[in-house]
């Protein structure tokens, strides 16, 4: 990813560092509209996820997470920006005339060839079952349920590692540090997701943040007591509690949010960091 630094001509361009290399030119048969409703609200209109709302209109790009074009080679035609995710996507033209979007693997360029199947080379962008991969392979877009499509390691720069195979299961180390068992016939894509330097971008101004649908963040201590447990007081008062809390009074900053006794706990060998 090429980071573009602006010449300092205005306050908004002084700190801006954006990626201006990848453009978006989606195909009409692979996009459809989506109705954005809620803006962080639930069915009763109550805010459940803060700092969301507004933003530019988006068209959803249909991504092929299943990679079920078996044993048919495809060629990367374009690398495009997707407003619905922080990773890039690339358009694939398959030999049978099929055209699909997939997540852009790191290092893939226009003209490269990819293929999906059981006996395919262990090369970047190819999709194959975990049982056919050697130990230590870097992978992304990993299935949890066979045939459902990739659900793990799909964000920009995400990569998991195959560390063991035993019986019907394969052991993976996920980007979060979690070590987990996956059915070894599940499909995964070789390589790392592209756009690794996404965290190096600096939008430079509040307006660019608003285009992404992200509202301003206000500290709890700057609110009134009716709005936040940290609010109120005379001047710069402390929060008045032993530990910080969410706007709804639950413990914040480090409390684990995973449900207890979940059915998938038996597949997790080591929890995430």
Swiss-Prot record:
Keywords: Chloroplast, Plastid, Ribonucleoprotein, Ribosomal protein. Disulfide bonds: none annotated. Its main location: plastid. InterPro entries: NA-bd_OB-fold (IPR012340), Rib_uL2_dom2 (IPR014722), Ribosomal_uL2 (IPR002171), Ribosomal_uL2_bac/org-type (IPR005880), Ribosomal_uL2_C (IPR022669), Ribosomal_uL2_CS (IPR022671), Ribosomal_uL2_dom3 (IPR014726), Ribosomal_uL2_RNA-bd_dom (IPR022666). One of its GO terms (biological process) is mitochondrial translation. The keyword Protease does not apply. Signal peptide: none annotated. SUPFAM superfamilies: Nucleic acid-binding proteins, Translation proteins SH3-like domain. Transmembrane segments: none annotated. One of its GO terms (cellular component) is chloroplast. The keyword Metal-binding does not apply. Part of the 50S ribosomal subunit. PANTHER family: LARGE RIBOSOMAL SUBUNIT PROTEIN UL2M, RIBOSOMAL PROTEIN L2. This is Large ribosomal subunit protein uL2cz/uL2cy.
């Amino acid at each position: 990813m090429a980071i573009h630094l602006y010449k300092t001509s205005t306050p908004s361009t002084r700190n801006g560092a954006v990626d201006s290399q990848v453009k978006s030119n989606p195909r009409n048969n692979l996009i459809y509209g989506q109705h954005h409703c809620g803006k962080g609200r639930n069915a009763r209109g109550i805010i459940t996820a803060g700092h969301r709302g507004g933003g530019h209109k988006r068209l959803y790009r249909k991504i092929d997470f299943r990679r079920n074009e078996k044993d048919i080679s495809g060629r990367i035609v374009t690398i495009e920006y997707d407003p619905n995710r922080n990773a890039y996507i690339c358009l694939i033209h398959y030999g049978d005339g099929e055209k699909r979007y997939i997540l852009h693997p790191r290092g893939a360029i226009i003209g490269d060839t990819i293929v999906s199947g059981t006996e395919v080379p262990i090369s970047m962008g190819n999709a194959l079952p975990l049982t056919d991969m050697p130990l230590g392979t870097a992978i992304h877009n990993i299935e949890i349920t066979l045939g459902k499509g990739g659900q793990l390691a799909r964000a920009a720069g995400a990569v998991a590692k195959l560390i063991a195979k035993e019986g019907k299961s394969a052991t993976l180390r996920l980007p979060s540090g979690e070590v987990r068992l996956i059915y070894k016939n599940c499909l995964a894509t070789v390589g790392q997701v592209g756009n690794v330097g996404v965290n190096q971008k600096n939008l430079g101004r509040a307006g660019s943040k608003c285009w992404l649908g992200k509202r301003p963040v206000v500290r709890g201590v700057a609110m009134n007591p009716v709005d936040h447990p940290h609010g109120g007081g005379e001047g710069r008062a402390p929060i008045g509690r032993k530990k910080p809390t969410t706007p709804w009074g639950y413990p914040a900053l480090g409390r684990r949010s995973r449900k207890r006794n979940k059915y998938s706990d038996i597949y997790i060998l080591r929890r995430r960091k």
